[in-house]
Amino acid sequence: MWNYTDKVKEHFFNPKNAGALDEADDVGEVGSITCGDALKLMMKVNPDQPGHRDANFQTFGCGSAIASLRSALTEMIIGKTVDEALGQVTNRDIAEYLGGLPPEKMDCSVMGAEALPAAIANFKGEGLVDDHEEGELVCKCFGIDAAMIERAVTVNSLTTLEEVTHYTKAGGSCQTCHEKIEEVLEAVLAKTGAVGPAQAPSPTPPARSGWTPSSRWPRRPRHAPAKLTNVQRMQKIMFAIEDWRPQIQRDGGDVELVDIDGKDIYVRLTGACSGCSQSAGTMMGVQAKLVEALGEFVRVKPASLLPVGA
């Protein structure tokens, strides 16, 4: 389990500025629900003074993304001018504001930082420069392109494949894009004159309790894992859900597997989780567990969305 600071927990249990913002002046949207993580950032600009007077968010993702990072981002930009927000709020600023994050969750802060320029471009009536060109999609599982990887590497001084995965999610599922990620990483390091992992130790992420360099991921093989049979795949799904159930049961809820349809896994939340405001976060927790267990991207959906007659 990851160790979170008290400030992260505070934003998780008492998120600020969640929900739609009527008559927002600037709106930025990044990510995709299909890929498991999406964020809509909405802001109002003070007509009398050059600063943001309000900011709200709507998001779909894991618990730290839903409540902590997005909530913290809105708190950080309220009161700042458009230019101040654009120039002073990076993903590292978000992580430091929260007192540090586990390396594995830095991707949530990166998405927050990606939404900000999108919202400001919308406010200025400008089209956000789209540096995604055809053929540049690197990680199909999470929809991560080369441009996003390049920005994450440059801003955060990343030097290894594992760090890129922590900060962007790229390569965190089927692993077939690892070689392409390393090509992008090496190109950025060569362009900036930075040293790679063979010449220097990796940078230390924002500090957090219980983290040491030895806790980083071991390098995974580049080849794709062996294909599972249908029975093996079903068993892994069942075992992963059973492994997740105790965490949900501690809060008075439960989850049960209903059906499997290719990449779509249908589950039913019961008890306290049924109709809970955090049910989307619970579903994403189950999804993350299944992606990790299967080594492929899958979508976890509520049983109510199961096609009629299935």
Swiss-Prot record:
Q: Which segments does the entry list as coiled coil? A: none
Q: Which top-level group of life is the source organism from?
A: Bacteria
Which keywords, in A-to-Z order, does the entry hold?
A: 2Fe-2S, Iron, Iron-sulfur, Metal-binding, Nitrogen fixation
Q: Which molecular function GO terms apply here?
A: 2 iron, 2 sulfur cluster binding; iron ion binding
Keyword set includes Transcription: no
InterPro entries this protein is in?
BFD-like_2Fe2S-bd_dom, BFD-like_2Fe2S-bd_dom_sf, FSCA_dom_sf, N_fixation_NifU, NIF_FeS_clus_asmbl_NifU, NIF_FeS_clus_asmbl_NifU_C, NIF_FeS_clus_asmbl_NifU_N
Region (Disordered) residue spans? 195-222
Under the heading SUPFAM superfamilies, the entry gives: Fe-S cluster assembly (FSCA) domain-like, SufE/NifU
Tell me one Pfam family matched here: NifU
Keyword field contains Iron-sulfur: yes
Gene3D superfamilies listed in its UniProt record: 3.90.1010.10, BFD-like [2Fe-2S]-binding domain, Fe-S cluster assembly (FSCA)
UniProt binding sites for [2Fe-2S] cluster: C139, C141, C174, C177
Function, in words: May be involved in the formation or repair of [Fe-S] clusters present in iron-sulfur proteins.
Q: Which family does it belong to?
A: Belongs to the NifU family.
Protein name per the record: Nitrogen fixation protein NifU
**Source organism per UniProt:** Azospirillum brasilense
Q: Which gene encodes it?
A: nifU
